[in-house]
């Protein structure tokens, strides 16, 4: 391919040429693209009957959460993510089922509907430490809808929601409602995984065995 590095180093193009999933990020010093090749077996293997987590992420907040959940034995799906978002690239590299929206576009009715259908099949909803603006506020609305329909909600909050709310308070309002109705808050990934342990069959079985020993 010919063109600038930014034009050529596109994940879809690289994957088509080299037949392997890749993740691209910008070098924080030079701004040039960095490409990470991921072997197909880089993602932990999860049995088909494992519990499923629907992750609400964006802006790079989800990649570590995806991998940690997979390593803990969860199946993972995610959305709604804008194309070109690093979390969308990570989801594609890990071969996760995910719902996308066009770059820099607000979440459309169609994307929201498809994300809601996907979330409906999940055993838990996880909200990553993502920023929320008018374009992705519907992701929080989706979490609220899922909570009202009986889904357990868990949130990773290493930064207060007030510092991530770019909606003139709408995100904070939804967040307070989620907390009020039982959303579990974790300050870091290990704590999040501990919150999820009762829903993870292997962990739950291990805890039961330990308790009866």
Predicted regions and their residues:
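A short, gly/pro- and small-residue-rich
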Residues: 135-153
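Conserved strand-to-helix beginnings and helix N-cap segments that scaffold or border functional pockets
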Residues: 5, 63-66, 136-140
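A short, aliphatic-rich alpha-helical micro-motif
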Residues: 119-120
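ABC ATPase nucleotide-binding domains
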Residues: 15-113, 124-128, 154-158, 162-168, ...
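ABC ATPase "signature
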Residues: 1-4, 8
């Amino acid at each position: 391919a010919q063109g600038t590095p930014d034009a050529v180093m596109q994940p879809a193009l690289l994957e088509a040429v080299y037949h392997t999933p890749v993740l691209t990020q910008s070098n924080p010093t030079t701004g040039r693209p960095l490409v990470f090749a991921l072997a197909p077996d880089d993602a932990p293997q999860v049995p088909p009957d494992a519990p499923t987590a629907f992750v609400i992420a964006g802006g790079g907040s989800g990649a570590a959460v995806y991998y940690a959940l997979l390593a803990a034995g969860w199946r993972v799906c995610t959305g709604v993510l804008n194309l070109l978002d690093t979390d969308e690239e990570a989801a594609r590299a890990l071969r996760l089922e995910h719902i996308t929206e066009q770059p820099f576009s607000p979440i459309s009715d169609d994307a929201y509907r498809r994300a809601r259908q996907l979330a409906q099949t999940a055993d838990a909803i996880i909200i990553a430490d993502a920023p929320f603006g008018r374009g992705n506020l519907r992701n929080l609305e989706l979490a609220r809808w899922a909570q009202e329909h009986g889904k357990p909600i868990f949130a990773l909050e290493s930064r207060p929601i007030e510092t991530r709310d770019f909606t003139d308070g709408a995100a904070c309002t939804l967040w307070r409602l989620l907390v009020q109705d039982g959303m579990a808050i974790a300050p870091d990934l290990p704590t999040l995984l501990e919150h999820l342990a009762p829903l993870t069959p292997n962990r739950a079985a291990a805890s039961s065995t330990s308790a009866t020993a």
